[in-house]
Amino acid sequence: MKVYIETMGCAMNSRDSEHLLSELSKLDYKETNDPKIADLILINTCSVREKPERKLFSEIGQFAKIKKPNAKIGVCGCTASHMGADILKKAPSVSFVLGARNVSKISQVIHKEKAVEVAIDYDESAYAFEFFEKKAQIRSLLNISIGCDKKCAYCIVPHTRGKEISIPMDLILKEAEKLANNGTKELMLLGQNVNNYGVRFSSEHAKVDFSDLLDKLSEIQGIERIRFTSPHPLHMNDGFLERFAKNPKVCKSIHMPLQSGSSAVLKMMRRGYSKEWFLNRVERLKALVPEVGISTDIIVGFPNESDKDFEDTMEVLEKVRFDTLYSFIYSPRPFTEAGAWKERVPLEVSYSRLERLQNRHKEILEEKAKLEVGKTHVVLVENRREMDNQIVGFEGRSDTGKFIEVTCKEKRNPGELVKVEIISHSKGRLIAAIKGN
């Protein structure tokens, strides 16, 4: 039998899709890229913003038209968690609904017509699953926690993924070793608040923290690089930043989700820190790792965001000069504090602010790219670049998270670490040549 999976949203959903495949493989399901021949079609959904949620029902309609007569459609993930049986009412072609915390139950629900499994209680089977043998990957995703205990006013995740729980370290290390044996060179650790690891386990566990986990993972032979997402700025204390700086296998790029540069808006968002506190953490980090790459998330148009609040955000953008920016207009979500507020920033104002923010960030990237010319980086080869069946180079990322295109005629295999020198740039893109010894 064949299964087709459509994955929407974040890296956590991508990992959940791997979990679904792992469970279904026990029932002899094989993945296919063609929904027309699938016996089972799964849509793994995102509900962080409204747009992907609207897209879900469009996708269901399209799949219902092209699927085999007896094929089943299942909706999984975060939208499944918060909409539950309402999905079945709105889309009768859906056979079952499976929440984000219930992926391990897929083998049960596919045999139950109109089943709804969306509980967000603790469940070790939500993360303890057999390693899914697949084509070797240079970069692999690895969950270290599930759920979230934060109460950000705009975020639906605690409602869809439940309370935060750390995965036992021995299970993480075992999975990482399997990934390394399967060819993985770079791990991407996943969690809603990865650097809060160790605060709660589902059973008795030795006291450990995120830095302890990073140190243990660094000892695994074959793993060359470790990245993680998404950390919370509140847990970036001096001890964590110092150990982050010292560990040679931990990539010197980090996600620091700002959300807003206004202390007033941050307070309304229930983020737990101020603009000044955030900038202090950045200053400390750059003192330890001057070349660190920093990415961030910014929401514009949050309820009651004034012109002054937005200017504060622009000020932080100028001071930090983020290497990567994920920016969005505020999207009201159900089951959130802010979703019930009546105050709204006019949509045209939000679009104007977003455009200004993104345009300035593009300029910053170009300014930073100019300064990279002549600098040396070590790139993990991800893909070869070919033209007319001839090798023209490769592409990959530096330790600091910079995406680099390398021009060369030599064959370099994915997974190799290669020293390169930046020779030019174009619209923020970095172009390099192999650095001689």
From Swiss-Prot:
Keywords: 4Fe-4S, Cytoplasm, Iron, Iron-sulfur, Metal-binding, S-adenosyl-L-methionine, Transferase, tRNA processing
Transmembrane feature ranges: none
Domain Radical SAM core: 134-367
InterPro entries in alphabetical order: Elp3/MiaA/NifB-like_rSAM, Methylthiotransferase, Methylthiotransferase_CS, Methylthiotransferase_N, Methylthiotransferase_N_sf, MiaB_methiolase, rSAM, rSAM_horseshoe
Textual note on the cofactor: Binds 2 [4Fe-4S] clusters. One cluster is coordinated with 3 cysteines and an exchangeable S-adenosyl-L-methionine.
All residue ranges annotated as the TRAM domain in the record: 370-436
Iron among keywords: yes
Gene3D superfamilies: Methylthiotransferase, N-terminal domain, tm_1862 like domain
Entry GO MF terms: 4 iron, 4 sulfur cluster binding; metal ion binding; N6-isopentenyladenosine methylthiotransferase activity
Binding site for [4Fe-4S] cluster 1: 10, 46, 78
EC class (word): transferase
Major subcellular location class: cytoplasm
Subunit structure: Monomer.
NCBIfam families: miaB-methiolase, MiaB/RimO family radical SAM methylthiotransferase
Task of the protein: Catalyzes the methylthiolation of N6-(dimethylallyl)adenosine (i(6)A), leading to the formation of 2-methylthio-N6-(dimethylallyl)adenosine (ms(2)i(6)A) at position 37 in tRNAs that read codons beginning with uridine.
HAMAP family the record matches: tRNA_metthiotr_MiaB
Name of the protein in question: tRNA-2-methylthio-N(6)-dimethylallyladenosine synthase
